[in-house]
Design a protein with these regions (language model features):
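Positively charged n-region of N-terminal signal peptides that target proteins for export
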Residues: 1-4
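Bacterial N-terminal signal peptides
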Residues: 6-16
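Short, low-complexity N-terminal intrinsically disordered segments enriched in polar/charged residues
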Residues: 19-52
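Short charge-dense sequence patches
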Residues: 24-33, 77-84, 127-128
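Short solvent-exposed beta->alpha transition segments
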Residues: 40-41, 48, 56-109
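Exposed beta-sheet edge and beta->alpha loop/turn motif
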Residues: 97-147
Length: 147
């Protein structure tokens, strides 16, 4: 009888451990989805400002540390130089996202890199990469590239 109880106890503990591992993995997957969804929404909102050439508002949505290093006028000139050659956005689709704690030239933190496939009037197939940093509970754009 003791052997049966011991076996059942071991089986229950093993099952609980498996459930805890599954729950932990499931919870991490859900956290990843939530993080990615929030970062993607922030990137899409920021891109809509850039699409409308509202560079002043896009600049205001960057982290303070970046605004301290670049004036609004510098940012606007830079964005005009990057985006004007491509023309108007015709379509944009999400490709994927990647999370990291390290970003070259930036302090360690929470970064999400979002990649989009974009069609412009002057370039039918381009890629846009938006890197965001989680700061004070918000996703803020720290880098933008269009290829």
């Amino acid at each position: 009888m003791r052997l049966v109880v011991a076996c059942l106890t071991c089986a229950c503990l093993a099952l609980l451990g498996s459930c805890a591992t599954h729950h932990s993995t499931s919870q991490k997957t859900e956290e990843k989805r939530t993080r990615e969804k929030e970062a993607r929404a922030a990137a899409t909102e920021w891109l809509s400002l850039v699409d409308a050439a509202d560079y002043a508002t896009a600049y205001a949505r960057e982290p303070e540390r970046l605004r301290a290093a670049t004036t609004q006028e510098q940012f606007i000139r830079s964005m005009e130089g990057r985006r004007a050659p491509f023309g108007r956005v015709l379509s944009r689709s999400f490709i994927g996202a990647a999370f990291t704690h390290k970003l070259t030239g930036s302090p360690d933190g929470h970064y999400e890199s979002i990649l989009f496939r974009t069609s412009f009037t002057n370039k039918s197939l381009a890629a846009e990469r938006v890197i965001l940093s989680r700061e004070s509970g918000k996703w803020l754009v720290v880098d933008y590239r269009v290829y």
